[in-house]
Each structure stands twice: as structure tokens, then as C-alpha cells.
Amino acid sequence: MHLYFSCFILLFVPGGKSLGINSHLKHMSNKSQDQVNRTRTVGSKDVAALPLSSYMFNLYQSFHHSELNHGMEAAPSLSLNHRADIIRSLAVKSYDHGGSLWTFLFDFSSLSQEEEHQFAEVRFDFRAFSDAILVGMEVIVDFFHQSSTCQSISGFCQSYLYVGSLTSTLWPRSSDTWVTFEATDIIHKWFERNDKGKNHSEGHMKQPKKLHRAKSAERRYQQRSTENPQILMMVYSNISKKEKLSGTATLLQDAAHSKYLAVMPGIQTIANSRRHRRSHIFNEHIMGMKHVPSADSSRTLCRRVDFFVDFKQIGWDSWIIHPVKYNAYRCEGECPSPVNERLKPNNHAYMQ
């Protein structure tokens, strides 16, 4: 039995995606699309299925080509990407623009305060707004937050959390049609509100002028979604120094300290973890797990043991040139699943 572990991070949450850097990027596009197709059938009915971001897949391919060519030409801001452990994209939930006044509505709840955030930028395809904006025009952008849990079949929630504003000049990149502008200050303001405990204060809950009516906002969003502008906020971050010093967690290390050593259907869902970087799907799958105070020393937890394969012994030696005998290893013992999320499985080594 072989266990394969992956060191990259790719989380699909409502309104957001993220990725980490490693060398296994070549065939990720098709696999990710299959995963999304599967998760759409089990997800909440209130959350609309989001199309996969072509920019994120181009980013995957850029890393793959840069590893093959050992160059720095493939990806936009590639030097910055290589300095980031995690690249997360947040898809806009709704937007509106009228001349120089713009309004973007994001869900920032997937951002983790435990990470070291280096940089953030907003990007969109200039061609989707070519009839409404001019090259070089200056715009004022208001950023609002709305959690995905506020979504319902009837429409958007009535209240939005104002995060901050910025002024930017719209210049398409010379190499493509993407318009980008820095939004690092918006991310910092979001975490400042969390630190001060004001993210639920009524003083910061208000109706943006461009989204003052839920029905109207929903209608405008549906009309523009057909153009698929792919307005994204890219957030570049590193894992914390403490987590780096602790080393990369593995599935076996996590299982050895897991508190979920027995399965009992019907138990309530365990409370959501504070670590938002983990997929929300994980929280849905830990229903029915019996909480045990600690691992019993009499239990034999999963470990790797020898498993020798001798082709001569099974009569295949005339077919096999090399190796005639090798150690394939196997897993023996009890392997509790899921692992305790309070540990640090930063390689996301969950059994598939």
C-alpha cells in the first residue's frame, strides 16, 4: 500500500481559491475541474457554482514552465510569487461601477491571520469593461465584506461591512489585457478590524451607495456575470515563522496525535477550526467522529512496515529484468481519520 503526500495548497471555498508552490503542477487543471464537479453536488444549495479561474490555471502552468526552464519570464510578478508560500484568489461576489466610482464586494473570511501577508492586488480583464472605462482613468474603489453564510436563495443580505477605499489609475498590462492595482492596504485594514473586534459593530455596517437595494444588486450581478470579467483579489502570503520552525507535518505524525480514534454516526459536527486556510469541506466531513480525550497507548497506530516483493518467488523472474526483489512497504495499524486540525498539517496530507 502506498501513501502519496502532496505539498501544495489548493482550496476551493465559496468566492475564493488558493494555491501553494511545488513541482507537481503539470496535470492539475483537469484534476481540479473534476474535483469541482464532484463538490458542486454536495455543496450548499445557496452557494452558486463558481467557474474556475483561468488566471489561476495560467499561474500553475507558469510555475511549471519556470521550473522546467529555470527562468523568470513565464508568470506575472513571478519573483514575488516565488517568495510567497500561498497565493490565494478571492472572486468578487458582486460589483458595480459608475464612472470613477467603483464598488467591490468580497468575502474576506477565508483569509488567515496566522499567515504573514506580503502583498495583495485586484485584477480584472480590461476587455470586459472597455465600454465603461478609459485607459489611464482614475477611479475610487470602495471595498465591502459579506460572508458567504449570508447568501440565500432570495438574494443578497441587506448589510455589508465596509473595509476601506483606495484610489487607483487603470492601466492594462503591456503583455496582456489584465488591469491590476495594489490592494495590500485593504487586507491590512480587514485584519485591523478583526484585532479591534469591530467587524460586527453596527457602526461599520452600512449600505454601499452602489448596492443599496439587494434585488437591484443581484440583478446587476447576474447581468454582468455573463461577461465573465473574472474580477479577482490576489493575496500573497507566507506561513508563519512558528509553523516553519515546526517542520512540515505528515499524515502519520498527525494520526499519532489524533483525538478522533473511533467512529460513531449521529454525533454533532465538531466546531469549525479557527484556521480558515483549511477547506470548509473538511468541516463538513468530520461529522460523526467520536471525541476521545487521548490516544490509548495499547492501540497500535498506523506505521510503515516492510513488505518485500520477490518476483522469483512468485514465478515472474523470467519477465522482470530489474529489480527482481524490492521493498514496497505497507501500512500497518490503526489510521484514524480525519486528523486533528489543531495540529499543523500544512502539507494537507489527508487520505484521498
UniProtKB/Swiss-Prot annotation:
Q: Which residues form the propeptide?
A: 19-278
Q: Where is this chain's protein located in or outside the cell?
A: Secreted
| Signal peptide region | 1-18
Say if the entry is tagged with keyword Amino-acid biosynthesis. no
Query: Which positions are glycosylated?
Result: N30, N37, N199, N238
Q: Name one Pfam family in it.
A: TGF_beta
Single GO cellular component term: extracellular space
Q: What induces it?
A: By dorsal mesoderm-inducing signals including activin and vegt. Not induced by wnt8 alone, but wnt8 potentiates the response to activin and vegt.
- Region described as Disordered: spans on this chain: 197-223
Molecular function per GO: cytokine activity; growth factor activity
Going by the UniProt record, its keywords in alphabetical order are: Cleavage on pair of basic residues, Developmental protein, Disulfide bond, Glycoprotein, Growth factor, Secreted, Signal
Give the UniProt family note.
Answer: Belongs to the TGF-beta family.
What does the annotation say about its assembly with partners?
A: Homodimer; disulfide-linked.
Quote the function comment for this protein.
Cooperation and regulatory loops of multiple nodals are essential for mesendoderm patterning in early embryos. Plays a role in mesoderm formation and may be required for neural development.
Q: What is this protein called?
A: Nodal homolog 4-B
What organism is listed for this UniProt entry?
Answer: Xenopus laevis (African clawed frog)
